[in-house]
Each structure stands twice: as C-alpha cells, then as structure tokens.
Amino acid sequence: MTKFKIAAVVFILLSVSNLFAQNRQNSTVPADNAKDNSVAADTDNQKASSVDYLMGGVFGAVTIDGKNYQQIGLRPEIKLWKLGIGLDLNILLDENGKIREEDWNEKMDYLDKVYFISWGKKGEPFYFKFGGLDSTTLGYGAIMRGYTNLLEYPTYKRQGLELSVDTTYTGMEIAVNNFKELAGRNSAVMGGGRVYVKPFSRLQIGGSFAGDLNEYKGLRDTDDDGYPDEVDMYPDNDDYVTQRDYYRKKLLDSGMSSAAVDAMLEDLSDAGLISTLEKGDLRNYSDERSRTGFWGVDAGLKLVDSDFFDLDIYSQFSKSLNTDGWGFTAPGIRITAGSIFEIYADYRQQSDEFIFGYYNDTYDLERAKYVDDGSGNLYVVTKKDKLKAAIASRGYMAGMKLNFFNFITGKAEYQDMNWGKEEEINDKSLKGELALNQNVLPLVSKAKAYYVQNNVEKIQWKTESTVMGGVFGLGVAEGVSIDFNYFITFEDKNGDGKIAGDDERITNVSVSTNSIF
C-alpha cells in the first residue's frame, strides 16, 4: 500500500508539471530562489500571469543516520499571486534497491513532504511562512537572532512558523521552531513573539518574549520511548532499549525460566557478547523538562528615510526568566544604501548568566547534547548550562551585508564581549557567508561558502558551535546542474574541551543532480 501511495504522488506531480509546462511562456522562474523560498514572477510578466511554477529534481547519493541511499527527489514550487507552496518528495533506495518506507508509513511523514507554505515576503504588511525557516529574528535580535530550523536538513526536517503583521500604528512578529515536537510524549516547542507600536511615523517601540518549553527536545528520540537515540540500542523499537532488554524478552518468549534467563545474560555479558547495561541505568526523559525564557523591550528611531539611504538608531534590553541575568544595547546604529549594502553596529553590556541572541543559528546543535565524561559515561548538557556559566561583560557587535551588482553577495558579523576583562570569556562570535551568483562564471551554476561560530572564548577554526560548509554547482546543460554540498559540524565527544581527531568531526557530503523541468 505504501508503494502505491508513493507512486500515485509522483504520478500526480509529473502530470501537474506537464500541465504547467504547456503554459509556461506566460511566466518566468528564477534559477535560484533559495533566499525567500518562493518563486518570484518576472516583473514584466506579472500582469500577464499571476501563476509561477517550478519543478526541480534531485538525484544522487545521500547519507541519513549513517546509512547510504540513492535519492530520487521531486521539488515542485508554485506561486499563485502571493501564495507560495513548496514540496520536498524524496524516494530513498537502499543498497538492495528497496524504498526506505519509514519515510512514508506514518501520518507525520506526509507533513515532512511540505517544504514551505508562504504568503507574501518579509517586510510586507502581512507575511506568513510554514515549514523550513532560513533566518528568523525578533526585533533587533537580543533574544532570537538568525534562528534557522534547517541546520540538519534533510537528515532531520522541522516544520516551523514565521509570521509578521505591520500596520500604520502597530505590528507583531511570531516564530515557532517545530510543530512536530508537539506530537508524542512530553510535547513542547521553542518559539517567541514581539508586538510593537509606532506612536510616530519614524519611532517604533516593541516588547518581546521567547522561550523553550523543553530543551531536552534537542535529544533525538525516534521511537518516543523517553530514551534518546544516542543511548538507545534499538532507536526504532520502543520495546527495547538495551541489549539485555532484547535478549531477556526473546529468551523468556522461548519458554526459559527467569532464573535461567538471568544466568544466561550474565554468561553473555561475561563473554563480552552483550553489554552489561540495563534500562534502569539510563535516564528516561519522558517526563523531564528543562525550560528557558526571556523577555525584552526595544525602541528604534529612523533618522533618515529616503529611497537610496536609510539611517536608524536603536536600543534594546532583555532579561532571562531563569537566571535574572540581563543585557542591553545602546546605542545601536544601522545604515542601509538600497540593496547595495547594510552596515550595523552596537555597544552592548550584560550581567552574569546572560547570553545575547540566545536562540541563534546554531541553537539546534546546542539545545541539548550528550557529552562523554572521559571514562565512557555519557551525560546531557543543555544550553541553559552555558547560560548559567556566562559572566558579566561588555563589548560590541558589528556586521555588514553586501550586494555587488548582483554578481557577488556576502555578509559578515562579529561580536566581542571582552572589553574591560583581563581574562578571556566565552562570548565571541563570528559569522560569514559569500555567494557567487549565477552566470558570473561559465559552467558555474552556484557557489557559496559559509562559516558560523557562536559564543566561544577564542575564535578557533573548530569548536562545538562551529558550522561550516559550501555548495558548488557545475552546470552541465541548460536547466541541469551537478551540485556538491559540504556540511561540517564538530562534537566534543570526550568532554575535554577540545576538538581533535576525525571522530569529533561530523562531515556530510552529498553529490546530486538538480534539474528544472
């Protein structure tokens, strides 16, 4: 039945693709729509057609949970006026040519096929997006700055929400990380909102709140049994957790007595054939929570407002509900010159137990994770632990965005909170991205490199909060590109505070063929 459903979905999409292709002369589709995840119509043709359509294909190797698959994917995107819909339909074939059916056998799996549903664009009076979130910021970013739920995509797909309303005198912003976390045991999400008023045309005053109802949701638990996959020997089966669970059940079902089973398990453990670990030795997170929350206020004043040049100043204050730690920025300044560049900077100061931009672009990696104590025992560390370890400091944050005549685009941001401190503290951040747009070089369909490192003592090439990677596309024919995607993160598995050795580097490399039909 599952195979029939998959075949039916693919057939319908290909049929719809052919139907739209027959009318495609009335609409144009940009080759790269990664920025806003919607298909934008060419302005010369907007009056002729309010419908845009793109059918993309992805073919190649992909690694999920350490297993290699051949991927056959369809990625249709359609725009009806302001409504945008994007799907991500992947059929994964294992080494035996069999379909990975666990991607299709539950109702929640079909939600994963939605890449995004959107209305409008950021900055418009009403904007809405459900699904993959590229970069989400509340206000000026003291609490939530640049959060993305696509960090582990496509290995793990999150379905979030981004919504904003802007009127003449007031407005609001809402962000949610992943509605899928509401399913199963101990449901919770991370999210926040901001409301603001504009008493004068150039003045905006806002208030924000954001929180995580359970940081432990950052621990992957596929079978939802309360034992995270990293310590669960049977992550896809909630009947077993340890090897002793499995063999005890099998031996008892065979008719052996409890005493005989216990004796045999001890013999197997003594021989080193199975682990001595029992389920009771592990921590069950089914009913455990670790909450975080922040509130904040902000104000911004537009000093210059013209078609080609804008100048804003701003200030913000926020406080942790967990630790009472606080932070403020004043003054902050932002200069924008059309679409060519944007420069921003602010002075900032914080108390103990506070981190600026707590919910940031690497949050899903830091939210909760297992760390080795050095003797082979694993324990969980959350980002709240990092919050409690933060110390009072002051410093600055500065950044810029650049668009060089649509040939090269880039952005960079740096934060240093070490002013007035003789010792180094864990609060330096560095982010950068450089992209070469299409048609700049022959045969190059896309090229992008990025690097992110948050809240570290020293800027080093490799840390646990480092995310680096790149995408390079080789155009082999019209509408066809061979893409090489590198994504690298790091994990301090032995808990020594250093990243060393290949086992602490997590590298994901995929090669795929992308086609636009």
Residue ranges and their predicted role:
Residues 8-18:
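Bacterial N-terminal signal peptides
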Residues 1-7:
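Bacterial N-terminal signal peptides that target proteins for export
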Residues 117, 434, 503-517:
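Outer-membrane beta-barrel "beta-signal"
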Residues 444-450, 467-487, 512-514:
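Conserved C-terminal beta-signal and adjacent last beta-strands/turns
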Residues 85-116, 141-143:
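Surface-exposed loop and membrane-interface regions of Gram-negative outer-membrane beta-barrel proteins
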Residues 50-52, 67, 84, 109, ...:
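Signature for the C-terminal beta-barrel architecture of outer-membrane proteins
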Residues 23-73:
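Short glycine/proline- and aromatic-enriched beta-strand/turn motifs that initiate or cap beta-hairpins
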Residues 131, 135-137, 156-158:
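Hydrophobic alpha-helical hairpins/lids featuring a short glycine-rich hinge
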